Amino acid sequence: NQKVAFNVAEEDMSIIGEEAFMNPVNSEEFTVGYYLNTKLGEFDVDFGVRLDDITRNGSVAEEHHDEDEGEEHEEEVELYDLNFSTQSYAIQFSQDWTDNLTVSLALSNVERAPGAQELFMNGPHLVTNRFEVGDVNLGTEVSNNIDFTMNYENDGAFASASFYANAVDNYIYLMDESEADHEEHEDEDHEEHHGDMIRANYLQQDAEFNGYELLVGRTITLPNGNLTVSLGQDSVIGKFNADSADESYVPRLTPKRTFIDVDYSSADYSAGISFKDVKPQYKTAMEESSTEGFMLVDMKVAKEFALSQDVGMTVSFFAKNLMDERARNHTSFVKNQVPLAGRNIGFKFNITF
């Protein structure tokens, strides 16, 4: 089984209005991809290669202040024509060790060109409450990845385990400035543009990520339906390399999470309850605050009704965050200002015809 794909795309990105933090950017992309699936002895082999040629045309505006207060600010616009050529490869070996157990090993080298926002942002972004500053000198991000996965199924029981390690050269991330940098910008009279917003810069450093995803469960057949119970957990740790300028953790890492789900379904009725235990996140980057853990409990019940031969209605009841936990999402830029929603309960009515 072989496939060849070609893709040509052009994108014009323009942010206008009060939140105009980036000048218009034109991007042109040309992609060639090849995919192969074959047998190699006892292994199923999947191989893919992708070549991208990306051009981004944009500009960055900067206001210059005259010493005389009566003079208007002069805006200087610098134009950029940036080109990136990337190559990505991936190969996966899979084998059925038994009738119930499948094991796979995947290796990949993935190159990613910087996005338009990472290159050309230069202004207040209200969603993140940051004054974001891109960098037109960012280079291609290169990731070397290894993934090992096991999947098991037998008589209603199922389990999966996935472990991965990623070494990323020139990892691109958005980092809040330090207090010292903030004071320096204040001295440069940039406070007028930042206001109360935190200045954040797009930077690059080598980083390493290691993590896992685990899931185990069972589906039980009952007289009138099926009951499925599952337990899962995931975790990831990302650190900048020891030889990088910053040896701290990568910002906004997802904390360790444990999931428990109980679901029942029949021909016209379904119900479920889920528990999500999110651990505290103390593995933080410089200038980043830690986040406390929390437990979320959600439930849902749905019933289907036949109103006529061709018309059906589904009535759903949902309740989210039943314990009314005060929870904050560590991966959010505004976690300290905006917590997750508290307890909310409601009904949904869906009619199909």
What spans do the regions from the language model cover?
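Outer-membrane beta-barrel strand-turn architecture
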Residues: N1, N37-D44, Q95-D99, V142, ...
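Face-selective signature of the C-terminal outer-membrane beta-barrel domain
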Residues: N1-E72, E76-D96, T102-S104, S108, ...
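Gram-negative outer-membrane beta-barrel transporters
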Residues: Y164-V168, H185-T284, M323
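Membrane-embedded beta-barrel scaffold of Gram-negative outer-membrane proteins
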Residues: T102-S108, R112-E118, G139-Y202, E208-N210
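Transmembrane beta-strands of outer-membrane beta-barrel pores
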Residues: V8-S14, L40-E42, L51-N57, L107-A113, ...
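Residues on the lipid-exposed face of transmembrane beta-strands in outer-membrane beta-barrel proteins
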Residues: N1, V32-T38, I91-Q95, L138, ...
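C-terminal beta-signal and adjacent terminal beta-strands/loops
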Residues: D169, K279-K283, K303-F353
